[in-house]
Amino acid sequence: MSIKLRHYIHPDDYRRIDEFLIRHYQPGNADGNWIEPAWEYMHGHPYLDSTSLRKIGVWEENGEIVAVSHYESQLGEAFFEFHPAYRHLRDEMLDHAERHLAGVSKEGGRKYLHAFINDNDPGFLSLVKSRGYEEDPEGDRPMCRFDIPEPFPAITLPEGFRLTSLAEECDWAKVHHALWRGFDHGEDVPMDEAELESRRRMFDTPKARRDLKIAVAAPDGDFVAFCGTFYEPAGKFAYVEPVATVPAYRRMGLGKAAVLEGIRRCAELGASLAYVGNDLPIYQVIGFKRVYDSKCFVKYLT
């Protein structure tokens, strides 16, 4: 049978692509695809444009998914996932992304696409350059890994601070406050029911474990640092996302402690390494090393 392209159908394709990413994961993320927890986190994130999910492209052969072209949060970005034997679909997948995943600029109303291509895929890099894409280094996304040591290093906190998790202390108002302030959205934190529900959906994704969602509580009980951690049992790895510290509590080692505690708990479950899609100093200090960069290329289509 021939390879067929069709539109994404939610929620069935959420599950099937989830399984696709797990099945084709190679140790050390050598496959270059998104790791499964990133796909899960995408669907719980409050910034996701869920109204456009149907525009995601799914390629099948004999009823098996062999490739996916998708965005992460909003139209205007494209990521590409492959069965290892179907990388010859690159050109067709880029065609699909330009037709269906393009965004429209706020200034001038021009159609554009940011295509994210791993720097260890020379064939795809050559393709996007030949089709008029230009590098946009500010959009590059590093993938980094941390080989979990044995014994695990001691985790220290300033006096009066403590580590906890959403399994032990699930307070969505505290979580929302820590993330809102931690991501520098301002001092006035909206606390309506819709905001708190969006945080619950963000962290209560299908395979999420509340015991891996780690918070640092200040002496007054408020959450002042937070690390959402995922464990993927088939690949035996942890994924760190998101991490934030309230501005007044930065440079105290709190974010680092939350990250390490999440990884430590994943190690107890069987993880031998952890991934994060960032190369910020906090991760470098812990010992994360770059695996590859997902290079950002931009093209204006109109």
What residues fall within each predicted segment?
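Conserved N-terminal entry element of GNAT/NAT acetyltransferase domains
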Residues: 1-14, 18-28, 134, 145-169
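Conserved donor-binding loop and adjoining core beta-sheet/short helix segment
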Residues: 6-14, 22-107, 114-119, 219-238, ...
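Flexible, substrate/cofactor-facing loop regions flanked by secondary structure
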Residues: 38-39, 150-234, 238
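Hydrophobic beta-strand residues of extracellular immunoglobulin-like
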Residues: 55-57, 212-215, 260, 297
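Acyl-donor-binding surface of acyltransferase catalytic domains
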Residues: 65, 72-160, 167, 294-301
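Conserved acetyl-CoA-binding loop-helix of GNAT-fold acetyltransferases
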Residues: 87-102, 245-247, 251-264, 268, ...
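Conserved hydrophobic beta-strand within the GNAT/NAT acetyltransferase core sheet
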Residues: 113-115, 240, 273-278
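Conserved active-site tyrosine of GNAT-family acetyltransferases
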Residues: 124-128, 283-284, 288
